[in-house]
Curated annotation (Swiss-Prot):
Biological process, per Gene Ontology: circadian rhythm
A Pfam family the protein falls into: KaiB
Quaternary organization: The KaiABC complex composition changes during the circadian cycle to control KaiC phosphorylation. Complexes KaiC(6), KaiA(2-4):KaiC(6), KaiB(6):KaiC(6) and KaiC(6):KaiB(6):KaiA(12) are among the most important forms, many form cooperatively. Undergoes a major conformational rearrangment; in the free state forms homotetramers as a dimer of dimers. When bound to the CI domain of KaiC switches to a monomeric thioredoxin-fold (KaiB(fs)). KaiB(fs) binds CikA, leading it to dephosphorylate phospho-RpaA.
Function: Key component of the KaiABC oscillator complex, which constitutes the main circadian regulator in cyanobacteria. Complex composition changes during the circadian cycle to control KaiC phosphorylation. KaiA stimulates KaiC autophosphorylation, while KaiB sequesters KaiA, leading to KaiC autodephosphorylation. Phospho-Ser-431 KaiC accumulation triggers binding of KaiB to form the KaiB(6):KaiC(6) complex, leading to changes in output regulators CikA and SasA. KaiB switches to a thioredoxin-like fold (KaiB(fs)) when bound to KaiC. A metamorphic protein which reversibly switches between an inactive tetrameric fold and a rare, thioredoxin-like monomeric fold (KaiB(fs)). KaiB(fs) binds phospho-KaiC, KaiA and CikA. KaiA and CikA compete for binding to KaiB(fs), and KaiB(fs) and SasA compete for binding to KaiC, thus the clock oscillator and output signal pathway are tightly coupled.
Keyword Secreted listed: no
UniProt name for this protein: Circadian clock oscillator protein KaiB
PANTHER family linked to this entry: CIRCADIAN CLOCK PROTEIN KAIB2, KAIB-LIKE PROTEIN 1
Keywords carried by this UniProt record: Biological rhythms
Organism encoding this protein: Synechococcus sp. (strain CC9311)
Similarity field: Belongs to the KaiB family.
Entries under SUPFAM superfamilies matching the protein: Thioredoxin-like
SMART domains: KaiB (SM01248)
Domain remarks: Has 2 forms, fold switches to a thioredoxin-like fold (KaiB(fs)) when bound to KaiC.
Metal-binding recorded as keyword: no
Length: 119
């Protein structure tokens, strides 16, 4: 089994508004559930650090950026839909591809599926 990738993410928020806090809470829940121990999240308050928002061309908050692994992906706005966040950042796709690769490798090696082994 290959080592899991490390995910680097940035969440841009505008102060401690309810929308910002909800985005952060939802995102942390997703990351702790799906990527525990293999992610780094940097929260950037664009009101306190407008230069960082300008450098990264952030025009709206909340904005979530996946920096690593490439390609860079962004989601702007509502982060409450877990599947939308994972698909939008190519995180769900990465997990599906890893599972498909494992399945293809097992097929190539002639290892039967669990259902076949029981019959």
């Amino acid at each position: 089994m290959s080592p899991r990738k490390t995910y680097i993410l940035k969440l841009y928020v505008a102060g401690n508004t309810p929308n910002s806090m909800r985005a952060l809470k939802t995102l942390r829940n997703i990351l702790e559930t799906e990527f525990k121990g293999v992610y780094a999240l940097k929260v950037i308050d664009v009101l306190k650090n407008p230069q960082l928002a300008e450098e990264d061309k952030i025009l709206a908050t909340p904005t979530l950026s996946k920096i690593l692994p490439p390609p860079v992906r962004r989601i702007i706005g509502d982060l409450s839909d877990r599947e939308r966040v994972l698909i939008g950042l190519d995180l769900l796709y990465d997990e599906l591809v890893d599972n498909d690769l494992n399945s293809s490798l097992m097929d190539a090696l002639g290892v039967p599926d669990i259902e076949e082994a029981d019959s």
